[in-house]
């Protein structure tokens, strides 16, 4: 029985090292109107006393207080996110068709202050221009937090992967402990950007400028579709939360 338990724990660990959750957005529902909202973060800083969130209204809060801020927001229902594999983000498109995408969209049941903070950090790492020193300090702080649940684990691993990816593509860090966490697809794209290898350019089928890389998935188009991630996520969220209301009423 013990060996079986260890095997299951190992399998769970492998799954969460392979998958990560991206495009974490707030679900807002007022009356019957459902919408997705971005986090109100404009910057993060890291000090000896913790991780600090700078908000759009000019206030600065400890990241562990973000739970209170979110729960006070009118109509806040929680978060949604998209589960993806390393190979599915090419930095040009998300290699999921609309049917696959629908099955990857999840309602995130986050409860603890640490989980709320990690959701905010995923957004910040995807969307904000963070300093190299901030990225270094961030991981040093995150490893101090207890990883006690599957949700915390996948959020932590996502943050870790995003930090390493940012350090590699924007700050040219190539240490082995960084590179092995950067998705191979993104490492290839970065090589293409730096060396302009025509074969890789054909593989990625890109016509955009190589000088601009964005980790946000919101504006990515889905495979074989003209729809963007944010458009389809909004459609599915409206259907899902409306159905839940009908079921509960």
Curated annotation (Swiss-Prot):
Q: Which Pfam families match?
A: Herpes_UL7
Keyword Calcium tagged = no
| Record's keyword terms, sorted | Host cytoplasm, Host Golgi apparatus, Virion, Virion tegument
Say yes or no: keyword Electron transport present. no
Q: What is its main location?
A: virion
Subcellular location, in the record's words?
Virion; Virion tegument; Host cytoplasm; Host Golgi apparatus
GO CC entries: host cell Golgi apparatus; viral tegument
Q: Which domain of life is it from?
A: Viruses
Biological function: Plays a critical role in cytoplasmic virus egress. Participates in the final step of tegumentation and envelope acquisition within the host cytoplasm.
- What family is this protein classified in? Belongs to the herpesviridae cytoplasmic envelopment protein 1 family.
| Annotated protein name in UniProt | Cytoplasmic envelopment protein 1
Organism, by scientific name, is Human herpesvirus 6B (strain Z29) (HHV-6 variant B)
């Amino acid at each position: 029985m013990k060996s079986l338990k260890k095997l299951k724990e190992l399998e769970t660990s492998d799954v969460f090292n392979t998958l990560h959750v991206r495009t974490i957005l707030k679900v807002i529902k007022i009356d019957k109107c459902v919408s997705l909202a971005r986090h109100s973060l404009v910057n993060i800083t890291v000090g000896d006393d913790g991780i600090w969130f700078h908000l759009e209204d000019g206030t600065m809060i400890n990241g562990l207080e973000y739970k209170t801020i979110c729960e006070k927001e009118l109509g806040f229902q929680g978060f949604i996110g998209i589960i993806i594999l390393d190979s599915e983000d090419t930095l040009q498109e998300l290699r999921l068709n609309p049917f696959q995408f629908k099955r990857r969209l999840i309602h995130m049941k986050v409860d603890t202050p640490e989980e709320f903070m990690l959701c905010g950090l995923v957004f910040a790492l995807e969307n904000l221009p963070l300093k190299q020193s901030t990225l270094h300090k961030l991981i040093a702080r995150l490893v101090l937090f207890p990883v006690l649940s599957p949700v915390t684990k996948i959020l932590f691993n996502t943050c870790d992967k995003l930090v390493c990816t940012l350090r590699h593509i924007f700050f040219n860090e190539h240490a082995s402990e960084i590179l092995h966490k950067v998705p191979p697809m993104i490492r290839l794209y970065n090589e293409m950007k730096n060396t302009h290898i025509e074969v890789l350019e054909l593989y990625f089928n890109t016509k955009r400028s190589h000088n601009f890389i964005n980790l946000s998935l919101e504006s990515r188009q889905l495979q074989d579709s003209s729809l963007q991630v944010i458009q389809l996520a909004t459609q599915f969220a409206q259907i899902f939360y409306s159905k839940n209301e009908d079921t509960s009423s």
